[in-house]
Amino acid sequence: VYKMLGTVTHGNLYVLAAAAQESLTASNIPELLKGSKIGCLQLNNFVGYALRIVLDRYDIEYEVRQNKEEANDTDKAYIYEVAANEITPTASYDYMIAAEPAVSTKVANTQNKLQVKGDLQELYGENGYPQAVLVAKADFIEENGQFIADFMQAVAENAGWLLADTTEAAEVVQAVADHLPDGATPSFTAENLTKEVIENCAVRFDGAASCKERVNTFLAELSDLLGKTFSAADAFYYTAE
């Protein structure tokens, strides 16, 4: 049995498009996505789920499609699963969805011909959606209350350390690498891990008590989207004694 200690990531997904495309905002997204084509990494995983939840929030009709060369002559948004190498300034998609740090790397490598044209977290609202949570075994929590309190404090402070001017990118990369299995490497490097990228990853710790309602809301939205029930009992959310 596990309990959730808190949320540690609040969304790192962004909208990319050619420089000439208009940026997506809460006020214009329904109109701009009419008849559009959207390329999305990991369409049948979290990235695609988050995109579709945002579209549902704005009552935007959409359809998952396979033929990437087709025109869209409807009022719906057509969504396609794409690979990372398909996200280019000359792609046939109006907008493309990807995650940091790949987003900033794409922008830099195309010399700004590809630009960030929307923030999926901002479009979702509510200070982003809960993308990753921290859990611990219930019996471990019960037997190690002080350790859990100290650990949660350290996790919260770590967000500040990541963004501190005195923290070098190489330090962050090494800190992550030190905790990976042998042979595994981080998905980012000291070259592409800027302070802006770290900030865009929305890494911060919100305790379970303070983010419970946000998590429940997002689970309900996932349930509606996928036709399955995702829920968490009150006992799942850790509250310090």
Report residues per predicted region:
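Short, glycine-/small- and polar/acidic-enriched structural segments
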Residues: 1-77, 94-100, 113-117
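Residues that flank catalytic or metal-binding motifs in active/ligand-binding sites
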Residues: 11, 34, 130-132, 232
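Short, solvent-exposed loop/beta-turn-alpha elements that line the ligand-binding surface or hinge
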Residues: 24-25, 35, 122-126, 203-212
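Surface-exposed intrinsically disordered loops and tails
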Residues: 65-80, 178-189
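Pocket-lining segment of extracytoplasmic ligand-binding domains
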Residues: 76-175
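Secondary-structure end/capping motifs
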Residues: 141-225
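Conserved C-terminal helix/tail region of periplasmic/extracytoplasmic solute-binding proteins
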Residues: 215-241
